[in-house]
Amino acid sequence: MSPYFKLSSALIFLAITMEALCSPIENTSTSNKDNDKETEHIEISAKPSGISRGALGQGFEIHREDLLSKQFEATGEKIFEDLPMDECTVTTTLGTIERDDSFYNSTESLYQSVASSTKISGSLKGAYTLGVSVAAVTNNIASSEEEVQGLSLNLKAYSMSSILKKNCVNTKPLSKDLVSDFEALDSEITKPWKLSSWKKYKVLLEKYGSRIVKESISGSSIYQYVFAKSSQKFNHRSFTVKACVSLAGPTKVGKLSFSGCTGVSQQEIEQSSSQSMIKKLVVRGGKTETRASLIGELDPDQINKFLIEAETDPSPIQYKFEPIWTILKTRYVGTEHFAKAVNLEQFYKGFLHFGCSYLHTTSAENKVAEMQKFDFAKTSDPDAPTYVCKVGPEGCQHHEDCHYRAAFWCECGGPYDLARTCFRHKFKKLKSGLTKKECYPNKESGFAWHGCRLHGLTCWCSAPNRSWEESWSGEDTNNALNDVHQVLMEKKRRDNAQQQY
């Protein structure tokens, strides 16, 4: 065994261990739960199977998938050439029924709930990655500018959990097509702000997905969702009553085995009938034919019978994912292809998810001024590139941005400005709860100076600000593997240099 192989193996093991120890623990309390969880033990007689494992090991482009409102089918892309499930999975029998509710006090809390339950990083809980899922369960009201609130009644019968062994994920042969397509990517991106520069990367994501299913939880589950615009000002109790009545109907709501529904009064039922909310019933797991029969208002006996199917006929009710670039970075650390895995990660997180597309405006005299661009960080290393999202400098860009105003001062832009290239910055709060710095042409009065200088009774852009500001940085995505990679590449260069003498 070569010294290089021993060193690289030791460093990779150390890096993976350090990442596991140092990764931030994300808050898994994704919604406000006022009701205690009710649990019940069940005996699981089912054995692990292809049906119970579902899409385990398959790749999906998550931003196109509905992770909430329907059964998630095992139709993903092949990522591994050979992945023997009996050898490569750890299956744990669960055997519990849980009944609880989740209150979503904002759109942000709904995004956080989806991100936590699927093991998708909190930094990716926004509209690009999870917007399809949130829109599906709220009938698109959460995709508008409106804030939403809501609640779900959660009835979950857990049969078993099947998770891929890390050793198999890191060592089993990848699909030959994936290897071929990945290694054919460009290592160096010459103009990273242009989407066309990333064409091959985008095609790879569309074909193989941004994530693989790392864990499959099987059983049977029923979720009754209700949502409304926050401006309608419904309280928690109103959502609870609406969900209970929607699930079982007004005459059988008290028969539900659910503490939150047992005390619903006739007055509350009548009041709820006049309250307009979005309702969505989601049935997952169990038998296909049983799922198909559970529509509309459900009889409590139907519900209990379906939940018990987790004992004998479980199918997936929840998936947890792992980024495909994490797998690729581990496989290709210390090689010339590692930069491609880093590129893939930062292109997805910064360009696509954060929304750092190239933005510019043109002045009345056809002069172009850039407002936003995805570019290399000043400290970027070709072996492990780092990118940033930059917003254009505040203030004037051209002389046409500056306008003389009485009392001897200069205004930059303004309501009557035709140049459209005097920039200002603002912080926009996203539905995910994060904030994003944006650059826009100033159309408001009173934006004084900002690079404009008075020359007699004329104003010129004599002192423009040339400093771009960062709104997103890929340095946050750097991890121990990047450091290991740089050590290995430096050792390779030294060894090659010595061999030439």
From Swiss-Prot:
Disulfide bonding pattern of the chain: C389-C402, C396-C410, C412-C422
GO CC annotation: extracellular region; nematocyst
Domain EGF-like: residue ranges: 388-422
InterPro entries in UniProt: MACPF
Subcellular location: Secreted; Nematocyst
Molecular functions per Gene Ontology: toxin activity
Assigned keywords, A-Z: Coiled coil, Cytolysis, Disulfide bond, EGF-like domain, Hemolysis, Nematocyst, Secreted, Signal, Toxin
Superkingdom field: Eukaryota
Biological process per Gene Ontology, one example term: killing of cells of another organism
Keyword Disulfide bond in record: yes
Coiled-coil zones: 135-159
Domain MACPF: 23-359
Propeptide boundaries: 23-35
Pfam families assigned to the protein according to its UniProt record, in alphabetical order: MACPF
Annotated signal sequence range: 1-22
Keyword Cell cycle in annotation: no
Physiological role: Causes lethal toxicity to the shrimp Palaemon paucidence, and hemolytic activity toward sheep red blood cells.
Name under which the protein is recorded: DELTA-alicitoxin-Pse2a
Organism annotation: Phyllodiscus semoni (Night anemone)
